Regions:
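N-terminal positively charged helical leader segments and presequences
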Residues: 1-84, 88-95
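Conserved, mostly hydrophobic/aromatic
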Residues: 17, 40, 111, 119, ...
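Glycine-rich beta-to-alpha transition loops that act as phosphate-gripper elements at the mouths
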Residues: 21-22, 72-76, 99-108, 124, ...
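Short acidic active-site motifs
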Residues: 26-27, 51, 106-110, 140, ...
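Alpha/beta enzyme core
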Residues: 29-35, 108-121
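Non-catalytic positions within long, well-ordered alpha-helices that form the structural scaffold/packing
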Residues: 33, 77, 112, 164-167
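Alpha-helix-loop-beta-strand connector modules within alpha/beta enzyme cores
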Residues: 53-71, 90-105, 134-157
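Glycine-rich phosphate-binding active-site loops on the catalytic face of alpha/beta enzymes
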Residues: 84-94, 118-132, 155-178
Length: 178
């Protein structure tokens, strides 16, 4: 079940696009198709700092023009992201929307203690970004999601069709949204 939002929490998007080296060329087109209120998690770990900052500025401009939030992963606070993304230890103390990664019930608990607004629980299904990783599968994913005190975003091998079958707050993808 999707967790209800409280007034204390930042609005958690229902659709989240994660950036990486593989989908970079298609990001502007993907942003143009996302509904207002969605989010882009900017990662781009593969770029040198100066190039990474320039790419962040360009994508932030494109996203904001469409009413899409921009969440930063391991970026300096001065870049102007709308929030932070990463493991519980990486989001603790961050500002704005806090999206934590989780792969287990213990990590969901750590995310809650770190002040996360939501968890991206993964990998739900097999994924190209982590070949060979053991997927949770729909049943185990839903068991973990039901025990989560936070809104859950499904990540890992996600498509619109798969997302429609999972009764959680939302879904995220790297390849499934480009």
């Amino acid at each position: 079940m999707a967790k209800r939002q409280t007034n204390k929490r930042a609005a958690v998007p229902r659709i989240i696009l994660l950036s990486d080296a593989r989908n970079d060329a298609a990001l502007e087109r993907a942003l143009a198709r996302l509904p207002r209120g969605s989010a882009l998690v900017f990662r781009h770990y593969h770029l040198p700092e100066a190039e990474r900052h320039m790419r962040f500025i360009a994508l932030k401009r494109a996203a904001r023009a469409r009413g899409i939030g921009v969440i930063g992963a391991r970026i300096p606070p001065g870049w102007g992201a709308d929030g932070v993304y990463g493991a519980a230890t990486e989001i603790a103390g961050g500002t704005g929307l806090k999206l934590a990664t989780a792969h287990s019930l213990a990590e969901i608990g750590a995310a809650r203690r770190a002040g996360a607004d939501a968890v991206l629980l993964s990998p739900v299904f097999a994924t190209r970004s982590h070949p060979g990783a053991t997927a949770l599968g729909a049943v185990r994913f839903l068991l973990l999601a039901r025990r989560s005190p936070l809104p859950v975003i499904a990540l890992g091998g996600m498509t619109l069709r798969r997302a429609a079958r999972l009764p959680v707050h939302g879904w995220a993808a790297i390849d499934g949204l480009v």
